[in-house]
C-alpha cells in the first residue's frame, strides 16, 4: 500500500506540485522532500528496507533526476519520472512531462503497476472495479462461456478473441502501457458472506478499448465494453458497474468521446446504453461490423453519461 511519497524536482518541473501535495495530505499519505541524491539513501538498512521511519516498499518517488530514478528502480522503489524530453528514463514506472494532471489515483496506479499489484479503479456500494490479474483469467473465461454471452464484446474484443492466452498477456501489459483497459468487476457481498474465502467474487468485467475504428471527433476516443455473469442480470449491477467506469473515464482519463456497440438483437443492452446517456451516432444508428448488424451509439460529454437516474 502506498503510504509515503518522496519528491525531488527542479523548479521548472514543480508546476502542479502544491496541489498534489495538498491532495496527498487529504488522503493521509506522507509527503517527504527527497533532498540530495546521496542523502536519500544514507539511512537505508537491511530488510525491511527503510528510510528513517519509512518502509521503502510503501514509498513512491517523484523526480526529474534520471540517476535517482534508476537507482530507485534498482532498489525496488516505484518511481514517477518527470521529463519534457523523449529520452529514456530508466527506472521509472511511468514518465510524464509535468505534474499538472497527476493525482493520487494516478500515483497509486503507478505504485501498483511497478509492484505487480492489480490497482483498484473504483469502489461502490456493492462493487469493486479492479485491474485483472492472471489468477482471474480462469474465472473470467468461465463467465464468457455462459449462455447469453454471444452478445458480449461486439467490437474489438470479439475480434481479438477471448482466450486464456490472450487474457493473460493482456493482464501483463495492458494497464502498464495504457493506464486503462478491461477491469474485473468484483462483488463485495461475497466476501462479507464468506462465499469465497473472504475474497470478493469476480462476476464480470467492464472497461474500455481504444475506439480506433471511429473517425469522428478529436482527442481520446474509447469504446465501453462489459460482460456480466448471468446470475447477476436484472439486479442493477450492469448499470452500476458501467457508471463507475464512465465516471472514472470522465475524471481520470480526460476522454473526449466514449462509444458503445450493441448487437441489434440485444434489447437489454440497448436499454442499458440509453439509460447511461448514449444516443445513436447517426439518424439510423446502425452500422456493420464483420457482417453483423450493430447499433453504434455515442455521447461526446462524459458528464452526461453519469447523471443520476431520474
What is the role of each PLM region?
Residues 70, 239, 264-282:
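Conserved active-site alpha-helix within GNAT-family acetyltransferase domains
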Residues 1-60, 64-127:
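Asp-based, Mg2+/Mn2+-dependent phosphohydrolase catalytic module
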Residues 5-7, 19-30, 94-231, 244-248, ...:
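GNAT-family acyltransferases
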Residues 15-19, 74, 219, 237-240, ...:
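Generic recognition of short, well-ordered alpha-helical segments
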Residues 10-13, 61, 221, 238, ...:
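Charged, low-complexity surface patches
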